Amino acid sequence: MNLSIRGAIPLLFATGLAQAAPVHQHGRAEAAVAVDDATLTLSFRAPLMDILGVERAPESEAESHHFQEQLDLVVAPLPAEAAGCTLQEEKVTDLAALFPAGDGHHHADDHDHDHDHDHDHDDHHHAHHQDLEATWTYQCDHIAELNAVTWPFLADFPSLTTEVILLLPSGQGARTLNSGDTRLPLE
């Protein structure tokens, strides 16, 4: 089976980045850096708790605006300038995807009355965990010059430690970006 590096990134997330960090652990983010020929793919996943402060739908317009501001902080990482990388594609989970219409507090519209009524209604808002996911794809003119990637948004989320899987021409590896670290050396 011939699987491209780019295609492998979602698989890494699905398997907990090869067990580098347990799936959905508050305070721990997962990232991947993959180089395939001249293509650089960067992926990031973090618990919403560490990005928004909560893992539930916004309860007001003001809260919705605040959540969007927090999501907007997650900007494209910066590959080393010498590599000559140009951003080709960016996918960041947006607020509408995290909390689809009708996924909020409208129980009358989507409540199944055939289930056990002994549950706690608060569980609807707090029981499941959600993650922010982002992927950036770059084309690089001088991929051999790629010696670092800076993740500027990590400075905005000091509660996070980020486990990074590396899939590079020189080999595979793992690194940790501790709270406050934004620059990931690749050498």
Give the label of every model feature segment.
Residues 110-118:
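Intrinsically disordered low-complexity segments with strong compositional bias
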Residues 15-18:
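N-terminal signal peptide c-region/cleavage motif recognized by signal peptidases
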Residues 12:
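Catalytic-core segments of enzymes that bind and process phosphorylated/nucleotide-bearing substrates
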Residues 1-9:
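Bacterial N-terminal signal peptides that target proteins for export
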Residues 21-110, 123-187:
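N-terminal soluble domains immediately following signal/targeting peptides that reside
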